[in-house]
A protein has these predicted regions:
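Structural/interface elements that position substrates and couple domains in central-metabolism enzymes
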Residues: 2-5, 10-13, 23-458
Length: 458
């Protein structure tokens, strides 16, 4: 109430203006021009992003893989996502005083004076196809031990809606002792890296961004906009951005599953699937997908993340899981169809020699993560077939470690084999002289060879 003082005058007591705590904390944000960025995880996603930011900011790239860090410190990227000359142009050493550039390390303490942390670690599934968030949790624990007021933590790893705020924020709060949206903030900007694609590189793909408050959303968006020439799209909240990413890959998985199922049907009907798709594709709104193996660390994994969250919410997803089952069956299908063709030609199956061309999960890329070529291999081996695998792109040591099989980087004599399966459409394979004959079966999984030169294709 107003108080009465002499001469019948009144005054109103001054009440302190209440400023929301989040706004007070946001005032602690460093201007982007003064920011130092930490990239946690330097794989197919993290390294290209780190290099892009390093052209405008001081960046610390962190990875727990000592061999990977040593390779990058020497200016070489075995994934081939970043050209060596570009990587070398931004690399900094420990004593380098340049204002911008990339310093790569395995030492978590080197991140201590960063104010923006970007997490780009893998999000795999276990053998039961359940999401594994351990890499994200470990990364969050590392960051939490260094977190200071005014810092921003941005996640890029593909997850189901809610992971950032429901799973990672509690880790950050517990270890740091800081309060979310008062002392520190979060953002989510899903990665859209397409391994092996030299046209759609990280800065040329439109980036979805989001933040834990409207002000932080603007901050995160401005950060990415400063390096992404394709532009950005600011989502309304973190969960929307998370959901958008996981359905990108789920939609593609389902569309490929549809044409894979068509391939099985048309094979029984004696119709060429690729010719059907070509004819149907003459309509303007027909979606053009081709049958094939669906592997890699994204399309073959991410639908399980969405399915997990749906089941937690009490809904059993039908189409998503059906698509996964269908696509996971294709490797076995290819092997069995090849064996049928061998029998039609009266070729010996048991102890026969068979060559698989390609082992990576996609063409012209060294990435062997979650490759479904392994399904073809195992199914053939179950028939006591002697299987050789040739892939000039894949690292034999990595394949041996991950899959316990031996592959070769040297092309053998194609004539030595009763059957050849072209599993991955590397450009070099398209130049090989593969011709069907009475003594050899040729199966073209991707449909890239002349139809008249092969016995079968999906």
């Amino acid at each position: 109430m107003a108080a009465k003082i002499k001469n019948n005058q009144y005054f109103v007591p001054l009440v302190p203006l209440h400023v929301p705590s989040s706004l007070k904390s946001e005032s602690m944000l460093k201007p982007l021009s003064e920011s130092k960025i930490a990239i946690i995880g330097l794989g197919y996603v993290g390294l290209p992003l780190a290099v892009a930011f390093a052209e405008k900011y001081k960046v610390i790239g962190f990875d727990i893989n000592v061999q990977r860090v040593e390779e990058l410190q020497k200016g070489h990227d075995h994934t081939l996502e970043v050209k060596d000359d570009l990587l070398q142009s931004v690399l900094l050493n420990h004593s380098d005083e340049r204002a911008v550039g990339l310093y790569i390390t395995t030492a978590g303490g080197a991140l201590s004076d960063c104010n923006i942390y970007i997490v780009t670690v893998p999000t795999p599934t276990d053998k039961h196809n359940r999401p594994v968030l351990t890499p994200m949790i470990k990364a969050s624990e590392t960051i939490a031990g260094l977190l200071k007021k005014g810092n921003v933590v941005i996640y890029e790893s593909t997850v189901y809606p809610g992971v950032t705020e429901e799973e990672m924020v509690p880790v950050l709060e517990r270890i740091s002792g800081l309060k979310y949206n008062e002392d520190f903030f979060c953002g989510y900007s899903p990665e859209r890296i397409n391994p092996g694609d030299k046209e759609h590189t990280v800065t040329k793909i439109l980036k979805v961004t989001s933040g834990s408050t409207p002000q932080i959303a603007d901050y995160v968006d401005a950060l990415y906009k400063s390096v992404i020439v394709a532009g950005t799209f600011k989502a309304s909240c973190i969960k929307v951005a998370e959901a958008a990413k996981v359905i990108e890959n789920s939609q593609r998985d389902i569309n490929i599953a549809f044409v894979n199922e068509l391939s099985k049907i048309f094979n029984l009907l004696g119709i060429d699937t690729h010719e059907v798709l070509e004819a149907a594709g003459t309509k303007w709104n027909f979606l053009k997908f081709k049958p094939g193996l669906v592997g890699g660390h994204c399309i073959g994994v991410d639908p399980y993340y969405l399915a997990q969250k749906a089941q937690e919410a009490g809904y059993h997803p039908e189409i998503i899981l059906a698509g996964r089952r269908l696509n996971d069956s294709i490797g076995k299908h290819v092997a069995q169809e090849t064996i049928k063709w061998m029998m039609r030609k009266d070729l010996k199956v048991i102890d026969a020699k068979l060559l698989i061309l390609g082992f990576t999960f996609k063409e012209d890329c060294p990435d062997v993560r979650n490759t479904r070529v392994i399904d073809i291999y195992h199914e053939l081996k179950s028939f006591d077939i002697n299987v050789d695998v040739y892939d000039p792109w894949a690292n034999p040591a990595e394949v041996k470690h991950e899959y316990k099989i031996t592959i070769s980087n040297s092309l053998p004599d194609l004539g030595d084999y009763a059957a050849v399966i072209l599993a991955v459409a590397h450009q070099d394979f398209k130049k090989l002289h593969l011709v069907k004959s009475d003594k050899q079966v040729v199966f073209d999984v991707k449909g890239v060879l002349n139809k008249d030169c092969v016995d079968a294709r999906l």
